[in-house]
Curated annotation (Swiss-Prot):
Residue stretches making up the Acylphosphatase-like domain: 7-95
Active site (record annotation): 22, 40
Stored InterPro entries: Acylphosphatase, Acylphosphatase-like_dom, Acylphosphatase-like_dom_sf, Acylphosphatase_CS
Organism of this sequence: Corynebacterium diphtheriae (strain ATCC 700971 / NCTC 13129 / Biotype gravis)
Recorded superkingdom: Bacteria
Range of residues in the leader sequence: none
Full protein name: Acylphosphatase
Keyword terms: Hydrolase
Recorded GO MF terms: acylphosphatase activity
EC number: 3.6.1.7
Catalytic reaction equation(s): an acyl phosphate + H2O = a carboxylate + phosphate + H(+)
Similarity comment: Belongs to the acylphosphatase family.
Transmembrane intervals: none
């Protein structure tokens, strides 16, 4: 059975700016072959948008949220997620 594509928007709160967090997200998304972006927000959060097979988006969310994820820079306190239909993102970029 083919996994349907999905769009994950995740707002990540913690010590996630100025520590290489967006570049880490980029590497995880590329490893999972997801499209989207990781952007710093003015309030200190990082917004992660990822599109691709839902199970791979769920894996990225698990990596973002995991308390024991070694190698992830910074500190993640909270991740708020929203799921929606994909909009046709191509490639993955940091902003």
């Amino acid at each position: 059975m083919h996994d349907a594509d999905a769009r994950l928007t995740a707002w990540v709160l913690g010590t996630v700016q100025g520590v290489g967090f967006r570049w880490w997200v980029y590497s995880q998304a590329k490893e999972l072959a997801l499209a989207g972006s990781a952007s710093n927000l003015v309030d200190g959060r990082v917004c992660v948008v990822a599109e691709g097979p839902k199970h791979l988006c769920e894996e990225l969310l698990r990596r973002l949220s995991a308390h024991d994820h070694s190698g992830r820079p910074g500190r993640v306190d909270t991740v708020v997620e929203r799921w929606s239909s994909p909009k046709g993102e191509v490639g993955f970029r940091t902003r």
